[in-house]
């Protein structure tokens, strides 16, 4: 691809490109030095973005002369740099005769460019500099993103920008990547949401381009007949037709100053072609109105019953300033007392509900109410439909009061005022998408902005929610039909309702939210790490005051530990039932608190259960008190017990249908950790219980407790101590930590054992686990460096070159403190024995490469691991979880991560060569081919001994 003279000279004369490519700058005006008047002359406008008052980062938006919009965010505290390019083209632009082409093109861009022709050049550079990368193709967007060590950002941008300047579309990789796309398709073919969309696409208007087959397969991406344009020529043609600077939006989040980031962008992205393209629009309606109403049933592969009510509505994206659908979705999706869900739950018909707008194409969208059904609910679909329309009618009569809109707007303003930022990669991806859709001033504010109710637009959306404009879509495992969707093999049929349903009574709109916080002042004070606040034999509490995240929020974690929690599969089931019941029983009363920024959840673990409280400091004490009172004294009704047991049993029954990689990982944990129980064991044990068993267990569980607690956030020690005293008074712990059994890592067999997961999937898989010799930090550090060294060549050889499958990865995978390396391949075509042989060959070759490895070769891998370990926390919740996990590992100095990072830098070639043979000898394979019977994992586990903490 030819370059302009100016761009070729940029590396010597950067001013040329700055003058020649920047058409406008917005958000942060530049400070121009004398002699830079030519740059100042090209500023078209300046604008100020709406940002949180506590957002201290610097922003700048550039519009280059080629039309590329660029959002730069300088965050001096960031320890990663990230970039995301969003291209406003996606699967909706696929040609009819080459479905999946946009997705296939996304794959091809990673496989070499003119300056970097090696197919792994980009990935290798990113991986060697503590980074990660990926991309996704949606209906109207294709997004490419990466993060990396900040010092390596210029080199990453060099490689990244060439995706959009000089991709090779290497013919040598065309067939292999077509196979990879097919593998991705096969890996998703049993996904329930894709199966539902496949049926919906048969019902919607075929002239709407979002109804095509987005993923692609060997069939749809087959080489055209001789005499027609080749597949490679079609890919290149699509690229030139649709990839244009005018439909691209780039976001970069990095610690470097804005001027430096701008210089790098101008140098590298100015020559992206400007063909004066505009964002593609869709005019054909998504749904032909004369085809509604319709009643559809689809077979689900999972044991799950659900009904979705779809209503075609105008796409509300352009109405983001007033958000006319927000109050409607909020009230229909409400879960408090008197809500649609509460009425259906009380009748035993449903156990979950959501409402909102999705599948927007810029012209039309779907307002969707999704209801998760009980078996009884599946028998009363007409009554559920009638109750839904009764709730909608209630909204029409009294739901659009202005105070409801204002309450939502106030809550949005609270959330935006203390907006938390994610990791740089998440931020860059979100911002590039936001820049593609919203005005510059709203790139941060759009999701929160509510300028005032637009009564006319609200009414228009409410008027669309009628029986005549409805597509009712029911899915269940017992649906059978001869009609099958074309790409995801979903059986479906059209039904006619027998008779109108009978609406249930009890619906009521919520009143004003009593949980809205009023004291949102930020307390001054910053601790470096958690401090021990209470230390008794039966109760330990830690406290860390924080103001660095600029939010008056607090994260509490309270671990209730009992020796009764995991003695057996029966005890493990009862622990899960108790945690699930507590969540279920508090759902209605605490739903308004959740809306107001206060959340609570209970989750089970091997030693008991953890209570998690997250939200504003103001109002958290009564929430803690209510949850503890509910746990200790609330009645457990028969209906509540059956509801939560059914939900857990549904999860365990569906385990064989879950992702194969997830099943393999669970099998590995069941084999090398104790105590652990399989889904089948938990399901069998759950059949033996009734409400009385759970009540008895609650008494035993609460009678024998040891409690660990931690508060991290914007609260002082006095308030933390007051809340701790409340917990001690309510829970009355009396056991010591020594009475609680720990989850223990086990040593893998030296016999290279093979276990099969319990799965009904159609793909093959091998998860090979290489285990370290002990649990020392030095062993962990060495294994981490080895894993980093293996990552890129494993992916390159087994995925790119050998085309074994879409899911191919290698990485460090500890089980608690036990170090290990996991190699994983999932394939639609290659059976597990062959995959295992390819892994053997790769590891044999790695042994040979190890002999040639020098300390200089090893240095970038050590540095990459070190940088990953030293990454800063990007959210209050993330920091709280990290410190909380440290207490579970008895890291009460909270310095394990820093010490590990130091050890990593000192890992020597001798350390690696000493560990490598042992890793090869202590392996466990989790293998699966379709039809394999599950292994007796418990027998394998019972024959294992604990992995030593330190080698003798």
Q: Model-found features: residue ranges?
A:
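N-terminal secretory signal peptides that target proteins for export/translocation
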Residues: 1-11
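Bacterial N-terminal signal peptides
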Residues: 16-28
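Boundary at the C-terminal end of the N-terminal hydrophobic targeting segment
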Residues: 31-35, 40, 44
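Mature N-terminal segment immediately following signal peptide/propeptide cleavage
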Residues: 52-84
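M16 family metallopeptidases and their MPP-like homologs
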Residues: 73, 78-94, 101-102, 119-163, ...
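Hydrophobic, small-residue-rich alpha-helical packing segments that form membrane-like cores
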Residues: 178, 182-185, 191-247, 253-265, ...
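His/Glu-based metal-binding/catalytic segments typifying zinc-dependent metallopeptidases
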Residues: 186, 278-337, 425-441, 446, ...
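Non-catalytic, conformational "gating/processing" segments within enzyme and secreted inhibitor domains
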Residues: 234-267, 691-727
């Amino acid at each position: 691809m030819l370059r302009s003279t100016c761009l070729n000279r940029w590396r010597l004369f950067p001013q040329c490109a700055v003058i020649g490519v920047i058409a406008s700058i917005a958000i942060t005006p530049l400070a121009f030095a004398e002699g830079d008047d030519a740059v100042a002359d090209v500023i078209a406008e300046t604008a100020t973005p709406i940002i949180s008052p506590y957002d201290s980062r610097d922003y700048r938006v550039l519009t280059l002369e080629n039309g590329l919009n660029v959002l730069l965010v300088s965050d001096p505290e960031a320890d990663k740099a990230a970039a995301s390019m969003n291209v406003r083209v996606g699967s909706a632009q696929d040609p009819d005769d080459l479905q999946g082409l946009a997705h296939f093109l996304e794959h091809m861009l990673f496989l070499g460019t003119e300056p970097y022709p090696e197919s792994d050049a980009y990935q290798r550079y990113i991986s060697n500099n503590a980074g990660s990368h990926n991309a996704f193709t949606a209906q109207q967007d294709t997004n490419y993103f990466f993060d990396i060590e900040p010092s390596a950002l210029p080199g990453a941008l060099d490689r990244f920008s060439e995706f959009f300047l000089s991709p090779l579309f290497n013919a040598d990789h065309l067939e292999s990547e077509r196979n990879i796309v097919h593998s991705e398709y096969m890996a998703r073919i049993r996904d329930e949401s894709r199966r539902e969309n496949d049926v919906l696409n048969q019902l919607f208007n075929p002239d709407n381009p979002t109804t095509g087959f987005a993923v692609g397969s060997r069939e749809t991406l087959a080489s055209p007949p001789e005499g027609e344009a080749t597949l490679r020529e079609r890919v290149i043609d699509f690229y030139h037709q649709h990839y244009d600077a005018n439909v691209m939006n780039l976001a970069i989040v990095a610690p470097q100053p804005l001027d430096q980031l701008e210089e790098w962008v101008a140098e590298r992205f100015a020559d992206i072609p400007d063909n004066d393209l505009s964002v593609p629009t869709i005019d054909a309606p998504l749904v032909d109105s004369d085809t509604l109403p319709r009643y559809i049933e689809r077979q689900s592969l999972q044991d799950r019953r659900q009904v979705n009510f779809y209503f075609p509505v105008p796409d509300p994206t352009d109405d983001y300033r007033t958000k006319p659908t927000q109050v409607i979705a909020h009230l229909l999706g409400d879960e408090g007392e008197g809500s649609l869900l509460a009425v259906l739950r009380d009748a035993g018909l449903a156990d979950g509900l959501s409402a909102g707008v999705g599948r927007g194409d810029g012209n039309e969208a779907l307002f969707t109410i999704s209801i998760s059904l009980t078996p009884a609910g599946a028998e009363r679909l007409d009554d559920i439909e009638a109750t839904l329309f009764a709730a909608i009618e209630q909204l029409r009569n009294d739901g659009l009061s202005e105070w409801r809109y204002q309450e939502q707007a106030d809550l949005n303003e609270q959330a935006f005022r203390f907006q938390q930022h994610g990791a740089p990669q998440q931020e860059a991806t979100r911002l590039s998408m936001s820049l593609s859709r919203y005005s510059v001033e709203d790139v941060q504010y759009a999701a929160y902005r509510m300028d005032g109710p637009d009564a006319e637009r609200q009414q228009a959306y409410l008027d669309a929610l009628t029986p005549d404009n409805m597509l009712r879509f029911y899915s269940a495992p017992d649906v059978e039909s001869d009609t099958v969707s074309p790409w995801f093999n979903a059986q479906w049929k059209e039904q006619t309702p027998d008779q109108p349903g009978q609406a249930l009574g009890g619906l009521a709109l919520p009143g004003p939210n009593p949980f809205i916080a009023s004291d949102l002042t930020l307390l001054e004070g910053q601790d470096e790490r958690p401090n021990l606040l209470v230390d008794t034999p039966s109760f330990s509490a830690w406290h860390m005051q924080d103001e660095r995240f600029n939010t008056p929020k607090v994260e509490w974690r309270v671990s209730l530990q009992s020796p009764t929690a995991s003695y057996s599969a029966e005890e493990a089931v009862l622990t899960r039932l108790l945690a699930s019941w507590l969540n279920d029983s508090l759902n209605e009363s605490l739903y308004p608190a959740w809306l107001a920024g206060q959340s609570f959840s209970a989750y089970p673990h091997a030693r008991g259960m953890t209570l998690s409280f997250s939200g504003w400091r103001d109002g958290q004490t009564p929430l803690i008190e209510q949850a503890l009172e509910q746990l200790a004294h609330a009645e457990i009704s028969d209906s509540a017990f059956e509801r939560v047991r059914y939900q857990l049993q549904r999860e365990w029954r569906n385990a064989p249908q879950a992702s194969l990689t997830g099943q393999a990982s669970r099998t590995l944990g069941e084999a090398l950790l104790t105590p652990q129980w399989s889904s089948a064991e938990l399901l069998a044990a759950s059949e033996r219980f009734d409400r009385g068993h759970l009540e008895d267990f609650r008494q035993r569980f609460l009678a024998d407790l040891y409690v660990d607690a931690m508060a991290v956030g914007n609260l002082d020690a006095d308030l933390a101590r007051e809340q701790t005293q409340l917990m001690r008074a309510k829970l009355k712990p009396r056991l010591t930590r020594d009475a609680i059994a720990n989850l223990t890592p086990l040593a893998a067999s030296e016999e290279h054992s093979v276990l099969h997961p319990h799965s009904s999937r159609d793909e093959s898989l091998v998860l090979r686990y290489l285990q370290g010799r002990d649990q020392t930090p030095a062993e962990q550090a060495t294994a981490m460096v080895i894993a980093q060294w293996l990552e890129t060549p494993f992916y390159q050889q087994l995925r790119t070159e050998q085309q074994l499958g879409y899911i191919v990865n290698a990485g460090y995978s500890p089980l608690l403190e036990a170090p290990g390396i996991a190699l994983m391949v999932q394939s639609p075509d290659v059976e597990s024995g062959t995959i295992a042989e390819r892994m053997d060959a790769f590891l044999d070759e790695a042994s040979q490469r190890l002999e040639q490895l020098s300390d200089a070769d090893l240095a970038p891998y050590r540095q990459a691991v070190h940088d990953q370990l030293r990454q800063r926390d990007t959210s209050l919740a993330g920091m709280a979880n990290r410190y909380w996990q440290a207490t579970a590992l008895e890291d009460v100095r909270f310095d394990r991560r820093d010490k590990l990072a130091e050890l990593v830098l000192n890992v020597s070639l001798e350390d690696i060569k000493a560990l490598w043979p042992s890793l090869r000898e202590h392996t466990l394979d989790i293998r699966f081919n379709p039809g394999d019977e599950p292994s007796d994992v418990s027998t394998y586990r019972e024959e294992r001994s604990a992995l030593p903490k330190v080698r003798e």
